[in-house]
């Protein structure tokens, strides 16, 4: 089975490097990613652009929009990406640069970091971003749920706050990153109600295969997620993602295979990403 990783990172972020070294125990480089993807039959990754202007600075209010992938000098050939949006840096020049970037074949959407920046999804500060999404027919990805930084503010990342923007911008398809975890039942209602809302299941855990297995063996840890998946009862709305480098690729695939019904694997691991991110088609043909 071919797999698309619909959410990973490839940026020079201190916390990502520390996580790769100390928690997930992986090689956070193009070589390391290529080796993990090859072993797991991952044919394409969709990276989420993010940058910091100083060490351990994310969320960085000074990082220029569009935030890209700056881990290395070049982006791997099997990676497309969604440039990141800093709402504090959305002046005319930055919006023009963002729009110019959207015409590139490898740019397949945009990423808004709710919770990391203190604005709700429906705030007018993001209106120019939504207008560009409509103009270019691109999906918008939102960070939702727990933030990978103590400086984040959780109220802005709650999945219920996406309902208003999903209703207002029906012509845009949105992806709720992390399914709003731990508020996944609220996220499930937003997905169930809105035809233009999807979710990825990346970043639910951090660590090695042993760390993932420990949570899977727990009688309680995934109860909230299983409840939310059953409530939604529509696996055409969910995408696979790793949030690499937070976890190793193959162990996370194996974890998701335990949680997603076998009959939905083709959609979850591949087809739904092609549907939500149509610009990736030339990269997988």
Indicate residue ranges for each PLM-predicted region.
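Active-site neighborhood of phospho(di)ester-bond hydrolases with catalytic His/Asp-centered motifs
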Residues: 3-6, 46-48, 82-84, 111, ...
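Mid-to-C-terminal alpha-helical segments outside catalytic/metal-binding sites
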Residues: 1-10, 15-44, 226-227, 231-239, ...
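Short, electropositive alpha-helical surface patch
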Residues: 58-79, 99-102, 106, 166-170, ...
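Active-site environment of divalent metal-dependent phosphoester hydrolases
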Residues: 11-13, 52-55, 88-90, 117, ...
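Catalytic pocket-lining loop regions of alpha/beta-barrel enzymes
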Residues: 105-109, 122-239
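Short, acidic/polar
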Residues: 27-37, 90-102, 184
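Active-site gating/metal-coordination segments in enzymes
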Residues: 59-156
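Divalent metal-dependent hydrolysis catalytic cores, especially in the metallo-beta-lactamase
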Residues: 24-57, 78-86, 108-109, 115, ...
């Amino acid at each position: 089975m071919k797999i698309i990783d619909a959410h990973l990172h490839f940026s020079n972020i201190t916390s990502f490097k520390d996580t790769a070294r100390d928690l997930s125990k992986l090689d956070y480089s193009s070589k390391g990613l290529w080796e993990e993807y090859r072993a797991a039959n991952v044919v394409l990754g969709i990276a989420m652009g993010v940058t910091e202007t100083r060490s351990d600075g994310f969320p960085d209010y000074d990082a220029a929009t569009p935030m890209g992938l700056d881990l290395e000098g070049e982006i791997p050939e099997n990676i497309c990406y969604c440039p990141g949006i800093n709402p504090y840096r959305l002046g005319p020049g930055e919006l023009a640069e963002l729009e110019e970037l959207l015409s590139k074949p490898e740019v397949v959407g945009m990423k808004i970091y709710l919770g990391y920046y203190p604005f709700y999804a429906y705030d007018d500060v993001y209106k120019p971003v939504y207008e560009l999404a409509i103009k270019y027919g691109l999906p918008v990805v939102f960070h939702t749920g727990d933030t990978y930084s103590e400086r984040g503010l959780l109220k802005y990342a709650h999945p219920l706050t996406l309902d208003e923007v999903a209703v207002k911008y029906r012509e845009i398809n949105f992806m709720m990153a992390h399914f709003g975890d731990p508020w996944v039942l609220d996220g499930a209602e937003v997905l169930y109600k809105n035809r233009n809302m999807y979710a990825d299941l990346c970043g639910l855990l951090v660590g090695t295969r042993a760390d993932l297995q420990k949570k899977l063996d727990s009688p309680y840890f995934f109860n909230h997620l299983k409840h939310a998946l059953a409530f939604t009862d529509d696996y055409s709305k969910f995408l696979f993602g790793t949030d690499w480098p937070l976890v190793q690729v193959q162990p996370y695939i194996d974890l998701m295979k335990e949680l997603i019904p076998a009959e939905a694997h083709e959609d979850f691991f591949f087809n739904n990403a092609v549907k939500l991110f149509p610009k990736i088609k030339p990269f997988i043909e």
